[in-house]
């Protein structure tokens, strides 16, 4: 498997120095992994949210040692209303003070960046003690590269910490995988403490890890690649939907990696 990955990387240029990428040299054994697991929002047969099931799942995730992520795509962030989002936050806050939550702004192509709505969503999350994960939107990603970075900086000024989220447009029409120039700019925003990467392309994530290691080692690259959960070997942490099925198993994997 490692040999196959090396062949894949041969034609991929490094994010630092432009040399061919060598992912094998990036493997980081005995590293403590930061695991965040997106919580599924379950529904009953009558269409009501199964809040008892939701709470039990949050509790199970916390007991396993992972931080829950609520109101993400696994929690139908783009389909639920503010009342449902707020209830999910309240129930999560009752179980843990270590959690993140999606800040989603629904818009249409051609609309401008809606900073006010992002800030409103962020305030709801922060009031419950969570860290906002900034979902992309048409207004955010359609801007110039300089304006994209400036928008994240504006949001970060109004929070103790935020997490970014790159989403491939194969998943959502507003999604965008940023250029490495944009990513470099994001690394310069102090209160942007990490970013989830969901391109499903190892080489893109390897490039981000290299750039992170060079520019800002404390920045978290959260893999969102459910098809390559071994990206933690190379220095990624994770914010995954797949882990919602078995948070205890992911936690055991993480512990085994940390101890070698």
PLM regions with names:
Residues 8-9, 19, 54, 213-215:
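Intrinsic disorder/low-complexity signature
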Residues 1-5, 99, 243:
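Short intrinsically disordered, low-complexity coil segments enriched in acidic
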Residues 1-20:
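N-terminal amphipathic/basic-hydrophobic helices that include classical n-h-c signal peptides
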Residues 11-13, 54, 82, 201, ...:
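Residue-level recognition of conserved structural "scaffold" positions that shape functional pockets
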Residues 22-175:
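Active-site beta->alpha loop and helix N-cap motifs at the rims of alpha/beta catalytic domains
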Residues 169-260:
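Catalytic alpha/beta core domains of metabolic enzymes, predominantly
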Residues 2-4, 36, 236:
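Generic N-terminal initiation segments characterized by hydrophobic and/or small/turn-forming residues
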């Amino acid at each position: 498997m490692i040999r196959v990955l090396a062949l894949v990387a041969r034609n991929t240029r490094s994010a630092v120095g432009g040399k061919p990428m060598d992912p094998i040299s990036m493997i980081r054994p005995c590293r403590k992994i930061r695991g965040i697991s997106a919580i599924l929002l379950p529904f009953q047969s009558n269409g009501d949210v199964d809040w008892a099931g939701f709470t039990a799942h949050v509790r199970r995730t916390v007991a396993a040692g992972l931080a829950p992520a609520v109101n993400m795509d696994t929690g139908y962030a783009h389909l639920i209303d503010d009342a449902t989002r707020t209830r999910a936050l309240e129930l999560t806050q009752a179980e843990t003070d270590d959690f993140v939550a999606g800040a989603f702004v629904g818009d249409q192509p051609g609309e401008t960046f809606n900073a006010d709505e992002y800030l409103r969503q962020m305030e709801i999350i922060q009031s419950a003690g969570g860290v906002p994960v900034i979902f992309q939107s048409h207004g955010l990603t359609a801007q110039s590269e300089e304006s994209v970075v400036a928008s994240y900086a504006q949001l970060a000024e109004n929070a103790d910490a935020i997490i970014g989220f790159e989403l491939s447009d194969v998943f959502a029409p507003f999604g965008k995988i940023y250029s490495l120039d944009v990513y470099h700019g994001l690394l310069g925003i102090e209160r942007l403490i990490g970013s989830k990467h969901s391109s499903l392309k190892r080489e893109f994530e390897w490039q981000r890890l290299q750039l992170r290691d060079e520019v800002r080692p404390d920045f978290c690259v959260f893999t969102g690649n459910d098809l390559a959960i071994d990206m933690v070997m190379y220095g990624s942490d994770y914010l995954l939907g797949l882990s919602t099925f078995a948070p205890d198993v992911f936690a055991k994997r993480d512990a085994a990696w940390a101890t070698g």
